Amino acid sequence: MSSILDIDLDYFRFLTRPLERLNELLGWAGRPVDAVFDHHQEALELWNDAIQKGVIRCPQFILHVDEHHDMMGERPPVSSGNFVYFAMRRWLACSVHWLVDMRIDSPNQWLSAEAWESVAERFTSGSRLPRCWPKPDLVTVAISPGFLSRKLRDRLMKRIGYIRSLPARKVL
């Protein structure tokens, strides 16, 4: 069983105490961030690489910490707006919890009835970590340029321990 903590920094932009929330999440994870990248859809490729390299098994749990659910359609190509749907279709035993404080919409508004039905039982959302959710075997962070101020981004990245001059993707 593998579990992934998937964080998009845009999640923190409307929080009154963003660094404290990031500290809570990383403290709960109990492990360093494994990879940082600019665009959130890069997570899916990285997760596949981690599976192929034997770093993790096919995920059964993804904690998706994001301002958006990233299930805005079921048609290719994979993008930042829909990659969670494609992850759920690829790994049929994978449950996703969308950790969100201010829910602006729902995946069922964007997916066809058939597409939503194929993932709905494995998708939950809320502002709290589900009870007994397994700690992650892999932690990934999307910077998502343009979604938050440079000042906040830099503060969050400093907490993560990431230096912007390094490549956007760490090697697993």
Question: What kind of region is each of these model predictions?
Answer:
Residues 1-172:
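Conserved alpha-helical scaffold segments that buttress catalytic/binding sites
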